[in-house]
């Protein structure tokens, strides 16, 4: 069985956040969603659990960070093409996110942009041509 990742994010408005993550490609799994959490599926191995602050507090005694003012993690998803990078960031902006809070990464073998969700969580979207990346690495050494 492939290893899976479940990213748990506290959100201020579950309905708004669920709609946002659906707009950028997540599919809500009703089996693991209720009025306190939405399980957003991005692939067989990548899930984002959106939780109300009350629900999130059940898992930690630590204070919930204000992601609009504090950054602890930058999450990144890979996509299949350069165009899909731009498309995903455009969808994030149309759904209420902020495009490109981080500099755009552009190389012959890689292209990456970022967005901030309505709660301030930072996401990177990247495309990588693995063969070209390996070639560039080999030439550099």
Placement of each model-derived feature along the sequence:
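Charge-dense, helix-prone N-terminal extensions
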Residues: 23, 27-32, 66-67, 88-95, ...
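Core segments of cupin and vicinal oxygen chelate
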Residues: 8-57
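Short loop segments at secondary-structure junctions
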Residues: 43-45, 53-55, 79-82, 118, ...
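N-terminal beta-strand motif that seeds the catalytic metal site of vicinal oxygen chelate
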Residues: 1-19, 30, 72-77, 126-141
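Vicinal oxygen chelate
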Residues: 4-12, 39-41, 62-141
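A short, acidic/glycine-rich surface segment
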Residues: 56-63, 133-135
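Alpha-helical elements of the RecA-like P-loop NTPase motor core of helicases
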Residues: 18, 86, 123
